[in-house]
Amino acid sequence: MINASGYLLSIIIPTYNNAELITATLASIHQSITDEVEVIIVNDGSTDLTEERIKAFYSEHSCNNVKYINHKNQGVAITRNVGLAHATGKYIGFIDSDDLVCKDYFTILLPKLREEKYDIVEFNLTRDINNLYQNKPGAKHALAEHEIILADDNYAPLLPTFRAGQWHLMTKIFHRDIIGNDRFEEHRRYEDMIFCPFQYFKCHCILKIENKLYYYRVNEKSITENIIDSDADSIFFAMRKMYNYVNKNKEKRTVATLMIINCFLEGRKLLRKKKGYYRYNESMLNDIQNALACCDTKIVKNKIILKMKYPHIDRSISEIRYKILSACKNLFFRKGF
């Protein structure tokens, strides 16, 4: 069904140098696709055979509901924004070009979207393809779902979602009115964390499907496998965006606290992985203390409060520990242990 406003669902696929995997991704998407769905592929200036693979796939699979856009390399955030600019569906979803969806992906999701009841439909992912949802008679993976209703400025139903902190963009289908004019932060990584939590605050009704409809392929190109210096800055940027939001929306403070704490812990972890210790810069130190000031500390563990209250001490202790461990390793190495 195609209505006057466009398709029911737009699927945006950003891609960059994924020639080896994109054919499998497209094949998984087209297992159960209907004419209610448009596919928007945005090639972020690939230098390998990605474009050739895409064209070869569609030369063998006739499909009138595909838009292919190729632009110079600008990063995944801008690439997704280009996809948003071309999307006409009432709902919008995202699939990464190296991942797979289960064969019942559209069979499950489209009936939910046709109801036009939900602001977000979310589901789970798996990193083990053997755990991907399969609709088999008598299978143990029966479809399980529940609604999250938000009313009268009561955001408590969002607490489990924010506590889990699973902001994977690919596991969410958004009503286009929820996204509105929001766009992905350009030239930032971890854009899912910067974007997704704020969409939930605009919702009235969310459908949570517990099953694993999406296979996330871990590969050497993923950001979790390739930490760069600016990654922690992006996480602290997300935290800053949230505490600034809370200062204007006090009624969302308790739920937002969970996201703020998640950002602090994730940013801290990235710094240690990249730098060897919690090497907060001055901007981060300022962000941490501003964030703590707007948190609902009743739901935060005391040891985390202390680390946020005294980030200079947290940094110094971790630096001393790092230097001692490094010296010991060097000593053992020289002595041939």
Model-found features: residue ranges?
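A conserved acidic beta->alpha catalytic loop
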Residues: 28, 43-54, 73
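Short beta-strand/loop segment that forms part of the nucleotide-sugar
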Residues: 36-45, 67-72, 97
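Glycine-rich, basic loop-to-helix element that forms the pyrophosphate-binding segment
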Residues: 71-87, 108
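Donor-binding/catalytic cores of nucleotide-activated saccharide
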Residues: 97-207, 217, 221-230
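Membrane-interface aromatic/basic loop that binds lipid-linked glycans or pyrophosphate carriers
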Residues: 275-337
